[in-house]
C-alpha cells in the first residue's frame, strides 16, 4: 500500500502515542499540523464523496493528500485568529482609535464643524470597560458625531501632556470653539454624557478655522521628549505673550526720574498773562 499517496486518520479514536510520522511520508509538515488540529467529530462519511474516501485496515479512513476536502481546510483555521479586545468590540463607523499625537491633532482639525468626542480609557479600567458598550450605542444613534479613542496605556505621555489624570475621561471639541467641555463619566453618571451631547451636538456653523487642541497643550506636547511631535507657536501667540510681558514689566529708574522732572516743571511754570 502506498503510504506516501494517502493520509491515514482514525476518526473514532486518534491516539497520539501511536502516531507515526512515517505514515505521512511525502507530506509537508504544514499539512500534517493542519490535520492534527481536526476534531474527529468533524470527519464523517457525509462530508466526503465516495471517490475521496477509501476504507483501510482496522476500519481506518483514508483520503488522498491531493484532494483534501475544502470542509477540512476551513475547519483548521477556526482557532487561529486573535481574540478581540473589549475596546475593539461593537465599534461603529464613526469611532476611531488614535494612533499618535499627530493623528489626534489632525483628526480634530479636519473635523470642521462636527462635534468630536475624545474618549480617554485604559484596558485595565473596569469603569471604562463597563461604559464602552453604552458609548458604542450612543455613537450608533449619533452618526454625525465623531468619536476618538485614546488608549492611556499606549499613549501615556500624550495623556500626561493633556493633563488626563482620571479615567474614563471625555473631552468635547467643536469647530472654532475648540474644547467646549470635559468631564469624567461612569455607568452611574452616563446622564452627564448624554446631556453634554444634547447641548453641544446640535447643528451649528462656526466662524473661523477649526481650533482643535489649545495652544498650551500643543506646546506641552512638543516639549515632551517622549513624544515625536513638533510644533512652533503661531506669531499671533508670540505677540500676545509679548504684550503680557510689557504690561507687567517694572518701570526703569530713568523713566521715573523723567516723570518727576516733568511734574516739577509744571509746578514752577509762570501763569499765563
Curated annotation (Swiss-Prot):
Keywords: Chloroplast, Disulfide bond, Electron transport, Plastid, Redox-active center, Transit peptide, Transport. Pfam families: Thioredoxin. CDD domains: TRX_family. The active site is at residues 125, 128. The keyword Cell wall biogenesis/degradation does not apply. Residues 62-202 form the Thioredoxin domain. It is found in: Plastid, Chloroplast. Disulfide bonds join 125-128. Coiled coil: none annotated. One of its GO terms (cellular component) is chloroplast. It comes from the Eukaryota. The keyword Transmembrane helix does not apply. Residues 1-44 form a transit peptide. InterPro entries: Thioredoxin-like_sf, Thioredoxin_domain. PROSITE patterns: THIOREDOXIN_2. Belongs to the thioredoxin family. Probable thiol-disulfide oxidoreductase that may participate in various redox reactions. This is Thioredoxin-like 1-3, chloroplastic. It comes from Arabidopsis thaliana.
Amino acid at each position: 500500500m502506498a503510504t506516501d499517496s494517502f493520509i491515514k486518520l482514525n476518526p473514532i479514536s486518534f491516539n497520539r502515542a501511536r502516531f507515526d510520522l512515517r505514515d505521512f511520508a511525502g507530506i509537508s509538515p504544514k499539512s500534517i499540523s493542519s490535520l492534527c488540529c481536526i476534531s474527529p467529530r468533524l470527519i464523517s462519511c457525509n462530508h466526503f464523496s465516495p471517490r475521496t474516501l477509501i476504507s483501510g485496515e482496522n476500519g481506518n479512513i483514508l483520503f488522498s493528500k491531493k484532494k483534501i476536502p475544502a470542509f477540512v481546510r476551513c475547519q483548521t483555521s477556526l482557532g487561529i485568529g486573535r481574540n478581540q479586545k473589549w475596546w475593539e468590540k461593537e465599534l461603529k463607523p464613526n469611532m476611531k482609535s488614535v494612533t499618535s499625537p499627530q493623528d489626534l491633532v489632525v483628526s480634530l482639525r479636519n473635523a470642521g464643524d462636527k462635534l468630536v468626542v475624545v474618549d480617554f480609557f485604559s484596558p485595565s479600567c473596569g469603569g471604562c470597560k463597563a461604559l464602552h458598550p453604552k458609548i458604542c450605542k450612543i455613537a450608533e444613534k449619533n452618526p454625525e458625531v465623531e468619536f476618538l479613542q485614546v488608549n492611556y496605556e499606549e499613549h501615556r505621555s500624550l495623556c500626561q501632556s493633556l493633563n488626563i489624570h482620571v479615567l474614563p475621561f471625555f473631552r468635547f471639541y467643536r469647530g472654532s470653539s475648540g474644547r467646549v467641555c470635559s468631564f469624567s463619566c461612569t455607568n452611574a453618571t452616563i446622564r452627564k454624557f448624554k446631556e453634554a451631547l444634547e447641548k453641544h451636538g446640535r447643528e451649528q456653523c462656526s466662524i473661523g478655522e477649526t481650533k482643535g487642541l489649545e495652544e498650551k497643550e500643543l506646546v506641552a506636547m512638543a516639549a515632551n521628549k517622549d513624544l515625536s511631535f513638533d510644533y512652533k507657536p503661531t506669531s499671533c501667540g508670540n505677540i500676545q505673550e509679548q504684550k503680557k510681558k510689557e504690561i507687567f514689566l517694572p518701570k526703569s529708574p530713568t523713566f521715573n526720574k523723567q516723570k518727576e522732572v516733568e511734574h516739577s516743571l509744571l509746578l514752577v511754570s509762570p501763569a499765563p498773562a
